[in-house]
Curated annotation (Swiss-Prot):
Heterodimer of an alpha and a beta chain. One of its GO terms (biological process) is L-arginine biosynthetic process. The record marks T169, G170 as: Involved in the stabilization of negative charge on the oxyanion by the formation of the oxyanion hole. GO terms for cellular component: chloroplast. This is Arginine biosynthesis bifunctional protein ArgJ, chloroplastic. It catalyses: N(2)-acetyl-L-ornithine + L-glutamate = N-acetyl-L-glutamate + L-ornithine; L-glutamate + acetyl-CoA = N-acetyl-L-glutamate + CoA + H(+).
Length: 464
């Protein structure tokens, strides 16, 4: 098990993708009234980037697991009504819940609220998410907005307020449009559905500058019982390891003890969302909430050492990695996903740190965008990762093209390497960078994207 990451964790007890259409990040000029049924038409779904394993994709996202419903509607929180901006995910029973949160000291009001709620109750029933205002750096009034929102949802669902968790995304320094939110909640609750459409509408509603929504669900068999894990996430910019402007909600019908669930979620986050980077900025709002309903019929998983726990952990890792890769793939202005794989390190944590260093390098990202196979930038970013290794054991490959072996540069076809980068960019595909630093058993991955002119344009005009 890897050592704890820097994020904070609090605990309480095949999908067929829609055809992908690249959209402009400019918001449509029309204003609409959006229902759950029409919500998914406002933005395309991300490609499915699920790792291979003993599981299969199923329909439903966060509603695939037994006991969960979701909805996404337009509630008037966005500056323009181009797509939904309020989402709700609920569980029919008291769910065991774990949450991971930003390491940014300027934590948003919903983050502070969730930490408090998770410290006072061992169960959860719902997650409310708004897009448009981050409700970060908003002081006591912003915190009260989060409390009032949770209280209103709790009354509509007839559950305790501390069983409601809150996530927000949008412009930092802006409080939520509470009147619009509160007025929309009855319609949001009335729209809840266990259907695929319910899950898809919620996944759309939480997006901001995202070009695509991110939703996934899988089914696997553990102990002879079919269990499902579903999830949705948002993120495109302000993405960097140790959580970023990314929100995630995970659902499962497995039954897991409180302590085991907390550790499993922490481990999966460290192998997925903490291993992605777009721009090096760590947000005030990042938050992943994971709920386990226990309705699958599988006996409670009570030990991390059990075969059942190990099988479930692998599946949870895969779902979170699939969502994390979709976020990096959808990086603001990106033309391709970058996947960095490191082997031969002393342990998993060291391999992960090296991979993050390479994926985070602005020079590596710019070289990929320029279709320049400048392997020296890769070697440099491995070297400043903070991990000690024998430089004479360093191997680097770009796709199937070896660039360095045992610390020595290799002759290679620069035109072929450049063409590999160009083809990946033209197809919005994946650039694979493989690195070996020795003969140790530590392996790790990280994901990023190239750095384009468009990224600067998007963020220069974000609030104007």
């Amino acid at each position: 098990m890897p050592p704890p990451s820097l994020l904070h964790l609090h605990s309480r007890a095949p999908l067929q993708p829609r055809p992908f259409r690249m959209n402009s990040r400019a918001a449509p000029s029309r204003v609409v009234v959006c229902s759950v049924a029409s919500a998914e038409g406002f933005i395309s779904a991300a490609p499915i980037l699920l790792p291979d394993g003993p599981w299969k994709q199923v329909e439903g996202g966060v509603t695939a697991a037994k006991g969960f419903k979701a909805a996404g509607i337009y509630g008037g929180l966005r500056a323009k009504g181009e797509k939904p901006d309020l989402a709700l995910v609920t569980c029919d029973v008291d769910a065991t819940v774990a949450g991971t949160f930003t390491t940014n000291v300027v934590a948003a009001a919903p983050v502070l609220y969730c930490k408090h709620a998770l410290s006072t109750s061992k169960t959860g029933r719902a997650v409310l998410i708004n897009a448009g205002q981050a409700n970060a750096a908003t002081g006591d009034l912003g915190y009260q907005d989060a409390v009032d929102s949770a209280d209103a949802v709790a009354k509509l669902l007839n559950v305790s307020t501390d069983n409601i968790l809150i996530q927000s995304t949008g412009v930092i320094g802006q409080r939520i449009k509470k009147e619009a939110l509160l007025n929309s909640l009855p319609r949001l609750v009335g729209s809840l559905s266990s259907s695929v459409q319910g899950a898809n509408s919620a996944a759309v509603a939480i997006t901001t500058t995202d070009l695509v929504s991110k939703s996934i669900a899988v089914q696997t068999e553990i102990g002879g019982v079919a269990i499902r894990i579903g999830g949705m996430a948002k993120g495109s910019g302000m993405i960097h390891p140790n959580m970023a402007t990314m929100l995630g909600v995970l659902t499962t019908d497995a039954q897991v003890s409180n302590d085991v669930w907390r550790e499993m979620v922490r481990t999966s986050v460290s192998r997925s969302f903490n291993q992605i980077t777009v721009d090096g900025d760590t947000s005030t709002n990042d938050c992943v909430i994971a709920m386990a309903s226990g309705l699958s019929g599988l006996s409670r998983i009570q030990s991390l050492d059990s075969i059942e726990a190990q099988q479930f952990q692998a599946c949870l890792d895969a779902v979170m990695q699939g969502l994390a890769k979709s976020i990096a793939w959808d990086g603001e202005g990106a033309t391709c996903l970058i996947e960095v794989t490191v082997s031969g390190a002393n342990n998993e944590a060291e391999a992960a740190k090296i991979a993050r260093s390479v994926a985070s390098s602005s020079l590596v990202k710019a070289a990929v965008f320029g279709r320049d196979p400048n392997w020296g930038r890769i070697a440099c970013s491995v070297g400043y990762s903070g991990i000690q290794f024998d430089a004479n054991r360093l191997d680097i490959s770009l796709g199937v093209i070896p660039l360095m072996k045992n610390g020595q540069p290799l002759p290679f076809d620069r035109s072929a390497a450049s063409r590999y980068l160009k083809d990946a960019g033209d197809a919005h595909g994946t650039v694979n960078i493989d690195i070996s630093v020795g003969s140790g058993g530590g392996n790790g991955k990280a994901w990023g994207c190239d750095l384009s002119y468009k990224y600067v344009e998007i963020n220069a005009e974000y609030t104007t």
